[in-house]
Amino acid sequence: MAKKQSILSPIIRITFTFLVLCGLVYPLIVTGIAQAVMKDNADGSLIYNDKDEVVGSKLIGQNFTDPRYFHGRVSSIEYKAEASGSNNYAPSNPDLAKRVEKSIDDWKKQNRAIPVTEVPIDLVTNSGSGLDPDISPKAASVQVDRISKLTNIPKEKLDQLIKDQTEGAALGLFGEDRVNVLKLNLELQKLMK
């Protein structure tokens, strides 16, 4: 019995020590460093409106359906973060063609002035996560005509808004230029007032 206790005692102490270190100390240290060094990212990269209310995250897209606003990428999960992922169909899958055709039909209904051949691919295809918050500057620009007609905001102002909200490639070489749809729509909302 004494031998059993002598074997169990260090096992229990080591387990408890690592439980405290890995379950409490390490997470607190990492959280403290993250809050000190990159508070915005540690808090979820939240975006606030003029009333200082949280309206979303710059990392997760939202579904904008009002034709007066810029629309983001198609999302097969309807931008529900808990359901992240997409039906990434193979090019040979007929369901992919159906999904793209539906996206194109939706586009035609709201953007009659822009031919389908001018529509950037990111407006009619899903992303891998289904949560992309960004679109290409071209994808934003092709929506200017519709938004200008519905809001009476001059196209030049909308073009400048897109230019102001365009973020370059990370470190100048990773990724492509992009526009965060939520941030763009918040700025658009200011112009509507």
UniProtKB/Swiss-Prot annotation:
It comes from the Bacteria. InterPro entries: KdpC. It comes from Bacillus mycoides (strain KBAB4). GO terms for molecular function: ATP binding; P-type potassium transmembrane transporter activity. It is a single-pass membrane protein. Part of the high-affinity ATP-driven potassium transport (or Kdp) system, which catalyzes the hydrolysis of ATP coupled with the electrogenic transport of potassium into the cytoplasm. This subunit acts as a catalytic chaperone that increases the ATP-binding affinity of the ATP-hydrolyzing subunit KdpB by the formation of a transient KdpB/KdpC/ATP ternary complex. It is found in: Cell membrane. GO terms for cellular component: plasma membrane. This is Potassium-transporting ATPase KdpC subunit. It holds the Pfam family KdpC. Keywords: ATP-binding, Cell membrane, Ion transport, Membrane, Nucleotide-binding, Potassium, Potassium transport, Transmembrane, Transmembrane helix, Transport. NCBIfam families: kdpC, PRK00315.1, PRK13997.1.
